[in-house]
């Protein structure tokens, strides 16, 4: 099957999904909300409202990876379809509110969401099975560097669940016998040095073999290079993180507006949480901890206290080991599970210590330990620390530090307000994913312990 036909079939399947999920919204609009707007629409206006939902669902479906049939389980697809539909419904509810003279009844919208989840579930089940029946797993080879091994890629990250891994080899072994790739459809290159990688890449391109590259730090930095021409030669200009002033202005404006609105809306949660923490052990409500932000500047990050007052009485900084950490109070377990402990950082954002999106701030002593193992770790301090970030959305709490660093540097290499919004919306999804709050081994001072990166 040609690549064109493959992509065409996938687009048709995704389009069918968007149509199916739009049907419950259209019914809800025509049967209820359309009759209650300030000035009832004629047919074209009704079509426009339905089309707006259709477009929103496609946009948020891409943000939440709701269409990735080949890379996810059916349950994951349904979960992400739910969020794409829910966010689209919420935006449309605001639009309908603006079109009406009063706050519209939300129950028809909830009923539409239930219908959308049913439609999405039917689609996900059938599309997932149809995809793997039409496009069975391809013969795949994993070529790796000794330092980073292929075990993580295949086992920890689940490559073998979606690809038919028929061959593994080091870069040296592959280069000595490139014919081993004959008959292979897909190649994964994991942590390979540029010289070896280029030899393998050239062979794969010449033989129409699809290649996925797990980048090294240098690759990530180069990905943000500015393309230009000098002296009649193509050039790539690479430098320190230095985004356009317009980007920084809009980013700071969004930080102020969003954090201020969020503090007002979430004030009841702040009050209830403060009372619960105080009533548990009569200790302080907030916990202030020194963290690092842009250019290694130190600041005091605020959190609701989730651990005992004497959690670090020995003076040693430790990362949490998750649910098994006996330093966490009963209230702390609840607010950590709901991410409520992070909410006071909205004050840090309003003050300008942090941004909504950026690399998560580390404690100085833990950052120093990371830098001993990975000197490149300091590169993430080019940008202001954030409440959420690329690594938080696309990784897990216990994703290896090297991979988290690569994700953070990928974000830094491509500053974009659009990307910031994508990360903000994607953060909503991970709030309800338990695995994103998993801890590390008990007693570890950093996630580097025992890690061969």
Located regions from the model:
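Signature of alpha-helical transmembrane segments in polytopic membrane proteins
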Residues: 1-132, 453
């Amino acid at each position: 099957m040609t690549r064109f036909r493959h992509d065409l079939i996938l687009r048709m399947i995704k389009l069918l999904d968007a149509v199916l999920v739009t049907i419950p919204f259209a019914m809800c609009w025509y049967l209820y909300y359309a009759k209650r707007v300030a000035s009832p629409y004629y047919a074209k206006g009704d079509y426009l409202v339905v089309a707006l939902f259709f477009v929103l669902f496609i946009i948020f479906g891409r943000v939440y990876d709701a269409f990735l049939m080949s890379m996810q389980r059916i349950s994951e697809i349904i979960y992400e379809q739910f969020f794409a539909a829910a966010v689209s419904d919420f935006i449309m509810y605001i639009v309908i509110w603006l079109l009406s003279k009063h706050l519209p009844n939300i129950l028809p919208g909830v009923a539409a969401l239930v219908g959308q989840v049913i439609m999405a579930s039917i689609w996900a089940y059938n599309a997932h099975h149809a995809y793997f029946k039409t496009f069975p797993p391809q013969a795949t080879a994993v070529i790796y560097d000794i330092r980073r091994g292929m075990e993580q890629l295949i086992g920890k990250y689940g490559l073998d669940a979606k690809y038919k891994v028929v061959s593994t080899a080091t870069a040296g072994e592959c280069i000595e016998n490139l014919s081993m790739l004959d008959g292979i459809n897909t190649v994964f290159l994991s942590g390979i040095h540029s010289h070896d990688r280029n030899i393998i890449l050239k062979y794969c391109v010449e033989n129409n073999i699809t290649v996925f590259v797990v980048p090294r730090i240098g690759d990530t930095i180069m990905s943000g290079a500015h393309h230009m021409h000098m002296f009649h030669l193509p050039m790539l200009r690479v430098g320190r993180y230095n985004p356009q002033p317009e980007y920084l202005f809009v980013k700071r404006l969004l930080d102020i507006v969003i954090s201020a609105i969020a503090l007002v809306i979430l004030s009841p949660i702040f009050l209830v949480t403060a009372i619960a923490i105080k009533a548990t052990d009569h200790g302080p409500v907030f916990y202030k901890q020194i963290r690092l932000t842009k250019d290694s500047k130190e600041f005091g990050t605020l959190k609701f206290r989730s651990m005992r007052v004497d959690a670090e009485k020995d003076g040693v900084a430790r990362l949490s080991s998750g649910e098994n950490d006996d330093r966490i109070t009963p209230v702390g377990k609840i607010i950590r599970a709901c991410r409520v402990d992070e909410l006071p950082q909205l004050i840090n954002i309003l003050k300008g210590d942090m941004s909504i999106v950026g690399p998560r701030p580390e404690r100085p002593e833990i950052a120093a330990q990371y830098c001993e193992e990975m000197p490149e770790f300091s590169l993430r301090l080019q940008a202001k620390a954030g409440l959420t970030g690329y690594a938080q959305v696309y990784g897990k709490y216990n994703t290896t530090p090297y991979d988290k660093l690569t994700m953070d540097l990928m974000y830094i290499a491509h500053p974009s307000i659009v990307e910031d919004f994508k990360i903000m919306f994607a953060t909503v999804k991970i709030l309800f994913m338990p695995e994103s709050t998993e801890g590390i081994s008990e007693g570890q001072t950093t996630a580097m312990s025992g890690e061969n990166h």
